[in-house]
């Protein structure tokens, strides 16, 4: 017996395996899979992603303090149901996965996205519709490209409708109990400061904090005092979007910051606003040198500046980096229960449940070869 397609007015309705298959092939959809493991579903001619959040982000999602930021075009289409993509949500099997999918459903509802939840086990879906099974399980972690459809079959026409812009998902600050946002530069350690564009061009500020090293994490802002022989610059040309992987620059940035420390000086890390790209570099430094988890490093920085908001792809890269450092290699589903080795990162490093990786491309090797830092300016391109 054929099951009728659900009405788009029934937002959040549970659907059968047959309805899922029909919606998947007949409508403009996005599939969000909240399972931490299991059989994969085909991604042909539809945008598909596996939603996996570390503990830090999962807590914010479940607490309602993490919001979905979308592309402007999608916001403009909120009142045009026929043009908006629909979301097919695959809930998780475990208790943690179920909590994640429930929180995501609430988030989708509050942002007025039409979505449906698969009400049958994925095994049932795949047994009834084996063509949905992804032939390449090893490619389970989707690389996010907003201008093309991953896994698009030859000759198939991809949907041209707007997509939920996972590139611009951003971890936004939760309630800080009235804590005022810190003024730049923000002191993270005795030799490491977080700043923005204004900080970087203020000579008095640089002098006040004994800053002689500056990491410029932008592709277009000038190295203002590059001609000063007492100033040293490191440029990491990156924009605040998913097309840039900062992981490969971590080793050189860490070495550059350590050079400032060894010379009894200080290093300023800045981007345009001082909330995303520069924060990512600072987090990587703390994780590597203090051997503390991403959760601990993030909370350390956030307590000093509540306005930090790194985008999800950078957080994903940091999650991969955490794994590469072996900070969570001995656990499955939880962060380490032991406190970080250094007192400077000893911030509530309690074991908290998490779900796998994070909205991120496959891990990128940190094998960028070290370069000499004995000249005043340096650039990455």
Curated annotation (Swiss-Prot):
Query: What name does the UniProt record give this protein?
Result: Dual specificity protein phosphatase lip-1
Where in the chain are disulfide-linked cysteines found?
none
EC assignment: the record states: 3.1.3.16, 3.1.3.48
**Does Cell cycle count among this protein's keywords?**
yes
Species: Caenorhabditis elegans
Q: Its gene?
A: lip-1
| Primary subcellular site in the record, as a coarse category | membrane
Q: What Gene Ontology terms for biological process does this UniProt record contain? A: cell division; embryo development ending in birth or egg hatching; germ cell development; meiotic cell cycle; negative regulation of ERK1 and ERK2 cascade; negative regulation of meiotic cell cycle; negative regulation of Ras protein signal transduction; Notch signaling pathway
**A single GO CC term, please?**
cytoplasm
Biased composition, class Polar residues, residue ranges: 365-381
Q: What is the enzyme's class at the highest EC level?
A: hydrolase
- Name the protein family: Belongs to the protein-tyrosine phosphatase family. Non-receptor class dual specificity subfamily.
């Amino acid at each position: 017996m054929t099951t009728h397609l659900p009405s788009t007015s029934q937002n959040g309705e549970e659907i059968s395996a047959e309805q899922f298959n029909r919606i998947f092939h007949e409508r403009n959809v996005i599939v969000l899979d909240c399972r931490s493991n299991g059989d994969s579903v085909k991604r042909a001619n539809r945008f598909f992603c596996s939603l996996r959040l570390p503990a830090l982000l999962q807590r914010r999602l479940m607490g309602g303090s993490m919001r979905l930021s979308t592309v402007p075009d999608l916001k403009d289409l909120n009142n045009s149901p026929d043009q908006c993509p629909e979301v097919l949500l695959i809930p998780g099997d475990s208790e943690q996965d179920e909590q994640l999918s429930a929180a995501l459903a609430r988030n989708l509802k509050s942002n007025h996205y039409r979505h449906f939840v698969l009400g049958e086990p994925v095994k049932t879906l795949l047994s009834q519709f084996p063509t949905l099974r992804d032939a390449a399980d090893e490619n389970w972690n989707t690389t996010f490209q907003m201008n093309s459809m991953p896994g698009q079959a030859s000759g198939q026409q991809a949907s041209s409708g707007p997509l939920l812009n996972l590139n611009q998902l951003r971890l936004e600050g939760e309630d800080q109990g009235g804590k005022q946002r810190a003024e730049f530069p923000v002191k993270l350690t005795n030799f490491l400061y977080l700043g923005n564009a204004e900080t970087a061009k203020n000579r008095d500020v640089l002098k006040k904090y004994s800053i002689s090293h500056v990491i410029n994490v932008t592709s277009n802002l000038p190295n203002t005092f590059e001609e000063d022989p007492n100033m040293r610059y490191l440029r990491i040309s990156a924009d605040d979007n998913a097309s840039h992987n900062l992981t490969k620059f971590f080793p050189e940035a860490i070495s550059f910051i350590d050079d400032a420390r060894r010379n009894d000086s200080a290093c300023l890390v800045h981007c345009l606003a001082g909330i995303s790209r520069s924060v990512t570099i600072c987090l990587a430094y703390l994780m590597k040198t203090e051997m503390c988890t991403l959760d601990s490093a993030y909370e350390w920085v956030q307590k000093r500046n509540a306005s930090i908001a790194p985008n999800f792809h950078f957080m994903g890269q940091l999650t991969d980096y955490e794994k590469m450092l072996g900070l969570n290699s001995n656990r499955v589903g939880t962060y380490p229960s032991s406190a970080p080795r250094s007192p400077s990162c000893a911030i509530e490093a309690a074991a908290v449940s998490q779900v796998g990786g994070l909205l991120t491309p496959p891990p990128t090797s940190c094998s960028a070869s070290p370069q000499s830092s004995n000249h005043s300016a340096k650039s990455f391109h």
